[in-house]
C-alpha cells in the first residue's frame, strides 16, 4: 500500500462492513476569509466533535460550480458581509435529537472563531444539493477552460491558510487562473490551474514553473507533493528534487530487490 503498484499488486482484500449511520446532518459554514475558515478546523477535533467530512472551498470555485449547475447553494453575503470561503461539514449519529444538540455546540464554537453563520442541511434535498455542488467542482472547472492542470498536495492542517496565501501570491505572476478546494480535516488540497486565453505551449511552460514553486513550498511547510492522487508520470519529474538523492537510492534499491525485472508499473522510479 502506497507504492503505487511498483512493488506488488493486491489479489485479495478482505473488507469489514460497518452499519450505515442512522442519521446525518451537514453544515455549510461561511467565512469572510480563508484564514478564519481554516483556523476553525482543529477546533472540531479539539472538542471531540468527530466530523465524518470537513471540506473547505474558496468563493471562486463555488461560483464556478453554481454556473455549471445553474443552482445557488452557498451564500455569497450574510448580513452585509461578503463571504470568501466555506466549510462543508458532515456529522452522523443515532438520532436527529443528538445531531441537533451537536449542531448547537458546533455553532457556538465556529461563530466564536469567526464564522459568519451556520446553515443546516438537515433534509435529504438540502444535503443532496450541498454535496452535489461540492462533487461538481472538477466538472465545473473543466466546463470553463480549454486547458487545466492540478496540484494535489498535502500540508499540515495548521499550514493550509499560509500555503494557499502563498499559492495565490505566486499565481499572480502568471496569466492563468487558480481555483482551490480540499479536505480540510487532513490538509489534502486540490489546486487547479486554468489556462484562460493562454495557448497550450505557454500554459505548459508557466504551469511547470508554478508547480515547481508551490511543490517546494509544500515541502518547506512539512507537506508532501501528493496527497491522494499519487506520483505516476505527472509528478515523476518533481519527485527526485522533493525526496532527495538518498531517498531515491533507497526506493530504487527496494524496487530492484522486489522487482528486479521491472515488471510492475515500470518507469515510475
Tell where the protein language model's regions lie, with residue ranges.
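Noncatalytic alpha-helical scaffold of FAD-dependent oxidoreductases
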Residues: 1-227, 231-269
Amino acid at each position: 500500500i502506497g507504492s503505487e503498484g511498483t512493488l506488488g499488486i493486491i489479489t485479495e482484500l478482505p473488507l469489514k462492513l460497518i452499519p450505515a449511520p442512522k442519521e446525518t446532518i451537514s453544515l455549510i459554514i461561511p467565512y469572510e476569509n480563508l484564514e478564519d475558515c481554516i483556523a476553525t478546523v482543529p477546533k472540531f477535533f479539539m472538542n471531540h466533535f468527530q466530523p465524518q467530512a470537513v471540506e473547505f472551498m474558496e468563493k471562486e470555485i463555488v461560483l464556478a460550480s453554481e454556473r455549471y449547475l445553474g443552482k445557488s447553494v452557498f451564500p455569497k453575503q450574510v448580513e452585509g458581509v461578503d463571504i470568501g470561503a466555506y466549510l462543508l461539514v458532515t456529522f452522523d449519529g443515532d438520532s436527529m435529537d443528538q445531531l441537533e444538540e451537536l449542531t448547537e455546540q458546533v455553532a457556538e464554537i465556529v461563530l466564536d472563531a469567526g464564522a459568519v453563520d451556520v446553515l443546516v442541511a438537515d433534509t435529504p434535498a438540502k444535503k443532496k444539493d450541498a454535496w452535489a455542488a461540492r462533487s461538481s467542482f472538477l466538472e465545473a472547472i473543466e466546463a470553463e477552460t480549454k486547458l487545466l492542470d492540478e496540484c494535489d498536495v498535502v500540508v499540515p492542517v495548521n499550514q493550509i491558510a499560509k500555503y494557499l496565501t502563498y499559492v495565490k501570491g505566486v499565481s499572480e505572476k502568471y496569466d492563468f487562473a487558480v481555483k482551490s478546494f480540499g479536505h480540510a480535516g487532513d490538509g489534502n488540497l486540490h489546486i487547479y490551474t486554468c489556462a484562460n486565453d493562454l495557448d497550450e505551449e505557454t500554459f505548459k511552460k508557466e504551469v511547470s514553473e508554478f508547480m515547481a514553486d508551490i511543490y517546494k513550498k509544500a515541502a518547506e511547510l512539512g507537506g508532501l507533493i501528493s496527497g491522494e492522487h499519487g506520483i505516476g508520470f505527472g509528478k515523476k519529474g518533481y519527485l527526485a528534487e522533493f525526496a532527495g538523492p538518498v531517498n531515491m537510492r533507497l526506493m530504487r534499491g527496494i524496487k530492484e530487490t522486489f522487482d528486479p525485472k521491472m515488471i510492475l508499473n515500470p518507469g515510475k522510479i
